[in-house]
A protein has these predicted regions:
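Accessory beta-strand-rich segments of carbohydrate-active enzymes
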Residues: 1-95, 118
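Short coil/turn motif common to extracellular beta-sandwich-like domains
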Residues: 2-7, 104-112
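Short glycine/proline/serine/threonine-rich loop/turn segments at secondary-structure transition edges
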Residues: 4, 44-49, 155-170
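Conserved aromatic beta-strand anchor motif in extracellular beta-sandwich/beta-rich domains
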Residues: 19-23, 126-132, 175
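Short strand-edge motifs at loop-to-beta-strand transitions and within beta-strands
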Residues: 34-38, 147-153
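Extracellular recognition modules
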Residues: 53-55, 170-174
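Short beta-strand segments of immunoglobulin-like
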Residues: 96-103
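Beta-strand-rich binding/interaction modules
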Residues: 106-143, 149-151
Length: 175
């Protein structure tokens, strides 16, 4: 894992949370309903056992609903969803949002891509295939010059999805 990005994700900590790595406070989160991620790459000590502590306060807070005794039960508290470590390369695709637009038998595929970590001579390649079929069709490849990129491709011979003949497509985005 040395030389890689280590991203610690806590999917649910109700309600106030403080995160400690090897005794050092590395962050906090004030919402029991949303996941949060912290980059621990610089805090991890390689070759020894590292310690993660999550301190959670589940008492009612005026800043996190429900409050004001508007519900007739005690809300849950503590870590109620997964905690996991995601290991990434130094530069990686952080977000890929794909949306499609169908017009007749051709479609338009628009992807908003966010990369993290930077670097030189990087490119993003995108390809598509129908689910259940082998082999992708290359849509294109584009140089990544910053952290954000929008790709816009036309895809021919698209079959629409419907309840009688469901057709699913798989899009692969590579850095």
């Amino acid at each position: 894992w040395k030389g890689k990005r280590l991203l610690l994700t806590i999917d649910g900590a109700a309600h106030e949370g403080e995160v400690y790595w090897n005794g050092k406070k590395i962050g906090e989160h004030h919402c029991g309903y949303t996941a949060f991620t912290m980059d621990i790459s610089d805090d991890a000590v390689y070759g020894i056992r590292n310690t993660l502590v999550v301190k959670v306060d589940s008492r009612e807070s005026v800043n996190i609903p429900p409050f004001g005794f508007v519900i007739d039960y005690m809300t849950y508290g503590g870590l109620y969803r997964e905690v996991w470590l995601d290991i990434k390369e130094k530069t990686y695709l952080k977000d890929v949002f794909v949306r499609g637009d169908l017009s007749g038998d051709s479609g338009r595929l628009i992807s908003e891509i966010t990369a993290d970590g930077g670097g030189e001579n990087l490119s993003v390649r995108q390809k598509i295939k129908r689910c259940g079929e082998s082999g992708y069709r290359l849509l294109g490849e584009c140089e990544l010059t910053g952290t954000k990129l929008v790709l816009d491709y036309t895809v021919e011979s698209v079959l629409p999805w419907d309840t009688v003949h469901p057709v699913c497509y798989e899009v692969c985005t590579q850095l």
